[in-house]
Amino acid sequence: MATVEDNKKLIADVLSTYPEKAAKKRAKHLGVYEEGEADCGVKSNKQSLPGVMTARGCAYAGSKGVVWGPIKDMVHISHGPVGCGYYSWSGRRNYYIGTTGVDSFGTMQFTSDFQERDIVFGGDKKLAKIIDEIEELFPLNGGVSVQSECPVGLIGDDIESVARTKSKETGKSVVPVRCEGFRGVSQSLGHHIANDMIRDWVFPTADKENAEKGFEGTPYDVAIIGDYNIGGDAWSSRILLEEIGLRVVAQWSGDGTLTEMKATPNVKLNLIHCYRSMNYISRHMEEKYGIPWLEYNFFGPSKIAASLREIASRFDEKIQAKAEEVIEKYRKQSEEIIAKYRPRLEGKTVMMMVGGLRPRHVVPAFKDLGMEIIGTGYEFAHGDDYKRTTGYVEDATLIYDDVTGYEFEEFVKELKPDLVAAGIKEKYVFQKMALPFRQMHSWDYSGPYHGYDGFAIFARDMDLALNSPTWGLIGTPWNK
């Protein structure tokens, strides 16, 4: 394995290709973790370098694609030209239960299809008409969110006024989300804006409804926050929480509903999976309603057991005892999976580059299989994400923030990992380099990966990726 000095030299060599000014900026985002440091030593949440290939998305992607889109009983309007909605259509595999087009709308695409005349004369009347049509065609919808695209912000349409008017007319929530793509430096601002709109447009109504109707709570009510049910992840997590005796009142946003969202201020504990995208609303609920929150990790049996114990520690001895029973229940299953796959995967090296939590959360699952992480990085992390990462990585691990296409390729060529785990933009680049690859945004059409049952699928998929006989038929460029 490369040493700290080796990786620092690698970074310097890669940066030497850039012009001096660009190299100086990118140097702040590349580093090597050294044991005992409080963070990973890289800058984050800064504007991408103009002219480079970045894997980041925009604020619209963060709001519509991540936070709001999976809420299944709402109709989410991509307000602007057709392209943004079209290219974000059903890309994340947010599974849900329901009848599409009747009471669930997750895989449908709604757009206001802005034309030149809408830019010139404004799109408020068109938006109002669309909401009327939605109410007529899909009367069982639970509400509407308006996900504004770049032109809406540039021309100054008053989507808030339309939302207030239509909400009064329909008696349903109409939530305007100012997530124009040009705002911020990545999809991360879109997450924040989406959280703020829940705070400002959903919770005030929820507080009133909860006060009028009442809520029959229990001491064991929890909410799953920031699990988008990719390939069924939230379901496999929910099973474990219910097995230890907790009642899951709501899950955001995968397979979630607006009704569940409104019920969340009544829970006893918010369990946050994707910290980066949902910590804002979790902190708000802690401040306003006094609801504590806890980040958990259900990737790999080691972390699952630790997380179950930490969650149970927030409740009474009954829940703590049940947590131990559940951990013991799945122990044999986990040991059999590890016994089957670890001999085939032991010592294999991995480089990751994903989004908001997986560059650290998935590490324990790899380690449970005897695999070694030699490089990891985030697309849109903030400083606190890199601080949280220190507990997952080993000394001399290469760390890269908002890594460019060129940098990532050069790092991989030099470090020669056995497996690259990143996104769809990187997948075919590295497969053409004859490197095993797993798409870690949507599990390469597999999953779930959360929970004990998910770990079995994860182990199988890593084995299939690394030990497929096809790799013996093609060579990597550096071996020619």
From Swiss-Prot:
As cofactor, the record names: [8Fe-7S] cluster; [7Fe-Mo-9S-C-homocitryl] cluster
The record ties this protein, via Gene3D superfamilies, to:
Nitrogenase molybdenum iron protein domain
Main EC class of this protein?
A: oxidoreductase
Tell me which InterPro entries the record gives. Answer: Nase/OxRdtase_comp1, Nase_comp1_asu, Nase_comp1_CS, Nase_Mo-Fe_asu
Q: Which PROSITE patterns match?
A: NITROGENASE_1_1, NITROGENASE_1_2
Query: Is-annotated flag, keyword Protease?
Result: no
Q: Which residues bind [8Fe-7S] cluster?
A: 58, 84, 150
| EC number, UniProt record | 1.18.6.1
Summarize where [7Fe-Mo-9S-C-homocitryl] cluster binds, as residue positions: 274, 441
Q: Describe its partners and assembly state.
A: Tetramer of two alpha and two beta chains. Forms complex with the iron protein (nitrogenase component 2).
Listed under catalytic activity are: N2 + 8 reduced [2Fe-2S]-[ferredoxin] + 16 ATP + 16 H2O = H2 + 8 oxidized [2Fe-2S]-[ferredoxin] + 2 NH4(+) + 16 ADP + 16 phosphate + 6 H(+)
Q: What is this protein called?
A: Nitrogenase molybdenum-iron protein alpha chain
PANTHER family hit by this protein:
NITROGENASE MOLYBDENUM-IRON PROTEIN ALPHA CHAIN
Recorded GO cellular component terms are: molybdenum-iron nitrogenase complex
Q: Name one GO molecular function term.
A: nitrogenase activity
GO terms under biological process: nitrogen fixation
Q: Any binding details for the cofactor?
A: Binds 1 [8Fe-7S] cluster per heterodimer.
Q: Which gene encodes it?
A: nifD
Q: Which organism is it from?
A: Crocosphaera subtropica (strain ATCC 51142 / BH68)
Record's keyword terms, sorted: ATP-binding, Iron, Iron-sulfur, Metal-binding, Molybdenum, Nitrogen fixation, Nucleotide-binding, Oxidoreductase
What the entry lists under NCBIfam families is as follows: N2-ase-Ialpha, nifD
According to its UniProt entry, the function of this protein is described as: This molybdenum-iron protein is part of the nitrogenase complex that catalyzes the key enzymatic reactions in nitrogen fixation.
Q: Which family does it belong to?
A: Belongs to the NifD/NifK/NifE/NifN family.
Q: Would the keyword ATP-binding turn up in this protein's UniProt record?
A: yes
